[in-house]
């Protein structure tokens, strides 16, 4: 995508409409905006349940991807303190994003959400923080916006082709010894490509979300890179090389090709703080 131009553009009237809607939401026209796309089960439970999907009524196999919005308050408020407006996106969500900071806006629940504004916000945001729920697609795919993926699972399906992207995965805990799996163990235990909750359960793995601090760290890395204030440490290049050397380009179980050119960076602070994970 980074090699092709953006083809979706707004008319002058649409831009005027978008600016007017921003004002209603309480956001200045030239504000810096970060979108927050955090998955829970509400969308499939409520929106899809109302549709005629005869082939599937039970969506719980997706539950391994669920995330707690409370873990995103810290990063939202820190970004707000830095001058960013943070908008929590979503058509249907389980619980509100609770913050007293007026620059942290629970757009999914403020009765001002529209399909048009979803796309308009995607076009003007600085970057997206996403759990890989699909809500990031307009910003990332249509407008080539940078994205920070957190709690991303399955790790072998990271969107490595997206330039200016960062990622960290959930912690994989063994139910046998209650220890966290290393990256190599995630791959060798065949859970790196699990796409159903049952798959993790059958392989004796429980997923634990990234901490608010881990989420904040990788988001700050994005901010610093976008503002040309990022200072890498001498160890970073080695850690990235080690991670991507371990990361398979094909699915271990059947050789299916998953990745081509790697354009993504794994969270630098996460790797610095968890060097054991790469052993």
Where are these regions (language model features)?
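Hydrophobic anchor at the start of a short beta-strand
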Residues: 33, 86, 147
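Leloir-type glycosyltransferase catalytic cores
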Residues: 1-24, 163-279
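Short hydrophobic beta-strand segments
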Residues: 29-46, 52
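Catalytic donor nucleotide-activated moiety binding site of glycosyltransferases and closely related
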Residues: 36-44, 67-114, 238-240, 244-245
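Short catalytic/ligand-binding loop motif for oxyanion handling, primarily in non-cytosolic enzymes
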Residues: 42-46, 95-98, 137-139, 156-160
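A donor-sugar binding/catalytic signature common to diverse glycosyltransferases
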Residues: 117-166
